[in-house]
Amino acid sequence: MKAFYIVYFVATSKKGISSTELSRKLWLRQKTCWYFKRKVMKAMESSGNHLLHGNVDVDEFFVGGQEDGKKGRGKKKKLVVLAIEKTGKGISRMYGKEIAKADSKHLGSFMKETIDTKANIKTDRWLGYRPLKNTFKNLLQIDSGKKGGNFPEIHRAIMLFKSWLRGIHHSVNDLQAYIDEYTYRFNRHLMKTATFENLIRRMIKAKPYYLYA
């Protein structure tokens, strides 16, 4: 029974929930909560069936390390690319991925997996995006502007993700799983009850996911 509570809390908690908090709420060992939460998070991976369309912004950023957010090299830094779908009311959906390099190969792979090729895409002038104009005909590269002023929505999304990551997970270990958890919940923030049901269905259909101590 408590397994269903873990799924419910992970699915519906607005800011997410740590395994420590689950342990306190459910009177279970923290390690037990951590292992089962990882199984829940595995079911939060994108299905790839719902591409972003319309107006889409894409940007890459670093997490971890002493110079969090700055482009450069660092032993503990990890690189993430984020794409957001914009509407008149703000951001409707988003996807993200940890990547090894911000080159056209890695950026292109992510964008082909998540964005409709007919979308109106906006990026900064980073060279890694330039070759992708052959695939994404409506890709526009512009200056970031003073303090990123030409990309306010995606920079705010990045800031909120980093704040959430520090508050719930405290590290960049298992970063892709954290990205999937965050974007899954964000993309369903208007349908909390349905989110729980959807996650249960996903877990039932999913292949067994084994974790070893």
Q: Where do the model's predicted regions map?
A:
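Residue-level recognition of single "structural anchor" positions
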Residues: 1-213
